[in-house]
Amino acid sequence: MKLLAFVFVFLASVYSSFAQSRPAVLMPGLGQHHHTISTKNPEAQRFFDQGLTLVFGFNHEEAERSFRRAAELDPHSAMAFWGIALALGPCINNVDLDPPHEKAAYEAEQKALSLAPDATERERAYIQALAKRYSPNANVDLRKLDADYANAMQGLFKSYPDDLDAATLYAESLMDLHPWKQWTLDGRPTEGTEEIIAVLESVLRRDPNHLGANHYYIHATESSPHPQWALASAKRLETLAPGAGHLVHMPAHTYMRVGDYAAAARSNALAADADRAYFRESNTSGSMYDMMYYCHNLHFLAASYSMAGDFAHAKQAADEVAAHAAPMLHDMPMAETYVPYPIFVLVRFHRWDDVLMLPAPKPGMAMTDAFWHFARGSAFAAKGQIAHAEAERQILATARKETPADVEFSFYFNKAQRLLDLAENILDARIAAAKGDHTQAISYWEKAVDVQDKLYYGEPPEWFYPVRESLGAALLLNGQADRAEVVFRADLEQYPRNPRSLFGLLKSLEAQNKTANVEEIRREFEVAWRNADVPLELSDP
């Protein structure tokens, strides 16, 4: 986590400077969420409500701005300062606070504590719980503070079982203990996950439109064997807060997992539009929200279009995210994660001539350079230029060996070496196939699938396409239709309605003269591929 932690330290350093660089304004399109606080100033109440809404939407810097405005309007409001401290705190996308950030949150919380005697009993409980999360000690164990806060929030939740915000924040505190790891790779809930789901479901039964509960419920279920549980939440978030780009985007996490790639693309496109409008009004381009969440929308958009077979739109989104992220690399090295996506889209659609016309990446982007060589090797193999492919493969192998074992190239904690290992196995498979050694090619495809299966969950997935598509195609082309059928069915378990695997399954059944359900599968494929702008064939895994 070394590189990831460095990135978040940088992000935290710019986070407060953006939050305090301009006064907050009341923003349109954020829904109607309300949490009554002790204040006689109606505008302070409105800014507090906006701040809490923005926390629920992971726009923490704008939330901090709103809470600070509430504190300016009512300097005696303990909950306004509680809100500042909450907004400065961690979430599943940023659990490692730097010491200055921790200090600022601690100071805001101390101010809230000093005003707490004039607050209500329930407000004091909120403030006292959050006090467990921060410390003046720069060398404090942040994970222990997170656990102490979660325990305190459990107490608040039990003391006020009808307080839906307390329940929602309690569930989030549990999620922060295992960020992006609510489920094991084999689909078992990790510690606390069942409690998270039970608490959020209890909130949604009483208030189906609760912004935070809908948001967190999608995150709590998306990597589970049951992502469809959150379909109702996804549908609600499409319209509950149209001005909150990240909340507009969130349905895509569920839609992608249930195989509705067109809906996932639509959610991300609408979210990107909402964020552009926000940047125009707020002048916050270059903020943490811009760097992380807007780029995430575009990245996810490219991935959604790619799954649906829409090359033109996938390439457009990939080019946009790479161009947007590139200027950030000096200050945010992890933004390089987005830069190779135009390369990946070309490989995904087998645009080999276009791959070979790509210029070399600029110096300083080691992973992008490695993936550029991977793409070139794949293109040369597809064209039968084996010597050139093997030369590119050697460069890729050297890059993997020279990459430190602890370096991550991921927002989801995956190691760079593992991603390069996956690329190397895929390239080996393509070179073996180009040589006519299909048995060896299948072996490499199987190794690649095994590596991909061990990647931590991320959405969109950390590797740009499901490698079982290629393994299934290789088996089918090698006359092993029965094994291909098994592989395509396994892929459809992980990527429901994946049109390429539906097509492969259809062809493998036809090759075995199996007629049961063939027409149903054909219709399902035609629906899934309806927005594609390219023909589909199995001749080039």
Regions found by a protein language model. Name each.
Residues 54, 88, 132, 174, ...:
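Residue at a conserved register position within TPR or TPR-like alpha-solenoid repeats
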Residues 78, 85, 89, 99-117, ...:
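TPR/TPR-like (Sel1-like) alpha-helical repeat modules
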Residues 48, 82-83, 168, 215-216, ...:
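Alpha-solenoid helical repeat scaffolds
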Residues 72, 157-159, 204-206, 236-243, ...:
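Solenoid-like repeat scaffolds
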Residues 42-50, 77-91, 118-138, 162-183, ...:
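Amphipathic alpha-helical repeat scaffolds of TPR domains
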